[in-house]
A protein has these predicted regions:
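Bacterial N-terminal signal peptides
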Residues: 12-24
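Repeat-blade elements of multi-bladed beta-propeller folds
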Residues: 51-55, 91-111, 137-163, 188-211, ...
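Active-site-proximal structural scaffolding
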Residues: 44, 211-214, 222, 265, ...
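Extracytoplasmic/lumenal domain signature
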Residues: 72-86, 112-139, 151, 163-186, ...
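Short glycine-/acidic-enriched loop or helix-start segments at secondary-structure transitions
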Residues: 63, 115, 213-214, 292-294
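N-terminal secretory signal peptides that target proteins for export/translocation
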Residues: 1-10
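Acidic, proline/glycine-rich low-complexity intrinsically disordered segments
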Residues: 51, 59, 65, 85, ...
Length: 330
């Protein structure tokens, strides 16, 4: 069978390409400048042709208000352009962002491309040079990445080897690069989710929770410097050691056995949502590791904060509330 990788790439992000065909109609109305909190809050109403953040806006509505594509015009749609940004050994799972006429997209190995949204021509490319041996951390086939964040003059990407990187939005030059991994005697993890950026910070979780010997947490980094603003752990560590924050003391009461030797899991591999009204970050926490509760937490209870929605204050990193959807996840 003949392979057509360019066609496959086009089909994955065709909806945005189709919208770009009509870009000249609304291009003059696109605000120019940095992506800010207020700009995202007012999107898409102020600029329906832009896609400023993961899910389109802080509400992650994923809905375009453009009207040029309708039942009368859809038959006239055609291919505007296509470009090759990957190979067979990766997956593209992120929606490209479109800011000021430039498309920002990442491939499975966390390489960022800035493309002219009208022509598809490459403006710049940033390669974090991820060691390909990290494919061993992939849970679901080839390397994959769910996209980037654009905020305050920078483009942010989480890499398959567990780093968070900021590059200059205009030039593609690296601004800072931090390793998000905390060893703790546990296994290395990857990052496949898209960062979220708001309130002067960039937020990222991690993947590999299904691999065992991982302990989930979300970290907020200063968007300008890359310094850690706060870190919220999602499952408790060794109770013989001081808890990192009070919520872990609460959570430890719901676990049994020596769960900390397994890590416990509870990674937040993608689901992070910023709420500007309450200045909060909502974290969707994943499954436990190992999966069977009687192995990771024999005699345990709810195993907080597995399979839980956690609300955290973005300034302090302290928990507002939580709701566990599956107590004692098994």
């Amino acid at each position: 069978m003949t392979s057509y990788p360019k066609i496959g790439l086009f089909l994955k992000i065709a909806p945005l390409f189709f919208a770009l065909i009509c870009r000249t109609i609304w291009a003059a109305d696109i605000p120019q400048g940095n992506v800010t909190d207020s700009r995202v809050i007012n999107s898409p109403s102020d600029e329906p042709g832009s896609w400023l953040t993961y899910g389109q806006n802080f509400k992650e509505q994923r809905f375009s208000e453009l009207t040029q594509i309708n039942t009368d015009t859809i038959a006239r749609l055609g291919l505007a352009w296509t470009t090759q940004i990957g190979d067979y050994n990766m997956r593209m799972q992120g929606t490209p962002l479109v800011v000021d006429g430039v498309m920002y997209v990442s491939n499975g190995w966390s390489v960022i491309y800035a493309l002219d949204a009208t022509t598809g021509e490459e403006i710049w490319k940033y390669d974090p040079e991820v060691d390909r041996s990290y494919i061993r951390l992939a849970c679901c086939g080839p390397a994959h990445n769910r996209g980037v964040a654009v905020y305050e003059g920078k483009v942010f990407v989480g890499t398959f080897d567990g780093r968070l990187i900021a590059v200059n939005k205009e030039s593609g030059e690296e601004v800072w690069d931090v390793d998000t991994w905390i060893p703790e005697g546990l296994g290395r993890f990857n990052i496949t989710g898209a960062p979220r950026a708001a309130a002067g910070k960039v937020y990222i979780g991690q993947g590999s929770g299904e691999s065992g010997h991982r302990r989930g947490y979300v970290t907020a980094y200063d968007a300008d410097t890359g310094e850690v603003s706060w870190r919220f752990f999602l499952v408790p560590g060794d109770p013989s050691q001081p808890f990192e924050h009070p919520e872990m003391e609460l959570a430890a009461q719901t676990w049994g056995g020596e769960w900390w030797k397994y890590g416990g899991g509870g990674t937040a591999w993608n689901s992070l949502v910023y709420d500007e009204e309450f200045n909060s970050l909502y974290i969707g926490v994943g499954n436990g590791a190992p999966w069977p509760r009687e192995i990771r937490s024999p005699g345990g209870g709810d195993d907080l904060f597995l399979s839980t929605i956690v609300s955290v204050d973005v300034e302090t990193g302290r928990m507002n509330w939580y709701y566990q959807t599956t107590p004692g996840d098994n």
